[in-house]
Design a protein with these regions (language model features):
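Trp/Phe/Arg-rich N-terminal binding region typifying the photolyase-homology
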Residues: 1-72, 76-77, 191-234
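A charged, amphipathic alpha-helical module
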Residues: 59, 63-192, 197
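Conserved small/polar residues in nucleotide/adenosyl-binding loops
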Residues: 235-240
Length: 240
């Protein structure tokens, strides 16, 4: 890292609500660079809904992290700034989730692997105005593709699938071209939608962070996947 002249961090901030493997990555970085690590743990939820006790547990960690950040940076927490970023994050998330929903059309107006590229913006910059603008532009493009009957999936869409788990990041092109050559389009994934967080206050943020695929119990995880498949017309329930 030093040889590449990348600015070194003063601390690392880790949350395991999406990827548990990040914990060890960040622990190693903190040890290697001899810097503090701030950890926010999102526990597995054995119940279907997120409990108030779970929200309180997560909220306490966030406030502890905030106090540490105030000490490290010399900057104070601002309720007004939080509300501003929350509103922008909501804009980004609403546009992003609606964009992913455009795959409900047959054929889909986009190649599902596009989501794995655009998702990077939601991961790193969801609370920035530029991200909200970008997601709204993406939604507009997908709607226009549907109206024109065009798609970024440059092949005949013979099969529509849900992609389970995280992307094969080192082999995105190999995975994408392998599926496309067989007429297979990934039209939905449990992974991409997980980065669309919508909430109205601090407690709502904590509840949203707890309501992610990694933290859901089996029944909730099952129902979410069934809904995604139904919404994207991967199958329909048999008539009663």
């Amino acid at each position: 890292i030093r040889q590449m002249q990348i600015p070194q961090p003063d601390f690392v901030l880790c949350c395991n609500n999406i990827c548990n493997c990040m914990i060890k990555w960040y622990e190693n970085i903190a040890k290697e660079l001899n810097i503090p690590m701030i950890m926010i743990d999102i526990p597995f939820n054995p119940d279907y809904e997120v409990s108030d006790a779970e929200v309180e547990y997560i909220k306490a960690q966030f406030w502890d992290a905030i106090h540490q950040l105030e000490e490290y940076t010399g900057k104070k927490w601002s309720d007004e700034r939080f509300k501003e970023v929350m509103e922008i994050s909501g804009r980004s998330s609403r546009a992003w989730l609606e964009a992913t929903e455009q795959a409900k059309y047959t054929p889909s107006p986009f190649n599902g692997f596009d989501l794995l590229n655009h998702m990077a913006v939601m991961v790193t910059a969801r609370g920035k105005k530029e991200a909200a603008d970008a997601m709204e532009t993406l939604l507009k493009e997908y709607k226009e593709n549907h109206e024109k009957g065009t798609s970024t999936f440059r092949a005949e869409e013979k099969y529509r699938i849900m992609f389970e788990g995280i992307a094969c990041w080192p082999w995105l092109r190999v995975t994408s071209t392998g599926l496309k050559s067989r007429g297979i389009n990934m039209v939905t994934t449990i992974y991409a939608d997980a980065f669309g967080f919508i909430y109205d206050d601090f407690d709502g943020m904590c509840r949203a962070y707890a309501n992610v695929p990694n933290a859901m119990n089996l029944e909730h995880a099952r129902d979410k996947r069934i809904k995604l498949c139904k919404d994207c017309l991967l199958y329909t329930s048999p008539s009663p």
